[in-house]
From Swiss-Prot:
Start and end residues of each stretch annotated as Disordered: 1-47
BP GO annotations: translation
Gene3D superfamilies per record: 1.10.287.3980
HAMAP family to which the protein is assigned, alphabetical: Ribosomal_bL34
Signal peptide, first to last residue: none
PROSITE patterns linked: RIBOSOMAL_L34 (PS00784)
Keyword Iron-sulfur annotated: no
Transmembrane regions listed in the UniProt entry: none
Record organism: Corynebacterium kroppenstedtii (strain DSM 44385 / JCM 11950 / CIP 105744 / CCUG 35717)
Entry GO terms, CC: ribonucleoprotein complex; ribosome
Protein name: Large ribosomal subunit protein bL34
Domain of life: Bacteria
Bias (Basic residues): 1-22, 36-47
Length: 47
């Protein structure tokens, strides 16, 4: 049985477009995520 290809193909532009700060701030739910991570004291808020 073949395992199949690796599913994680790193791409910095897609990473920041999907998970970045600007995209998080563009929706209400995303702002909630960022504020929750601030409240928790995360060193890194977004990707």
């Amino acid at each position: 049985m073949a395992k199949g290809k690796r599913t994680f193909q790193p791409n910095n532009r897609r990473r920041s477009r999907v998970h970045g700060f600007r995209s998080r701030m563009s929706t209400r739910a995303g702002r909630a995520i960022v504020s929750a991570r601030r409240r928790k004291g995360r060193k890194s808020l977004t990707a």
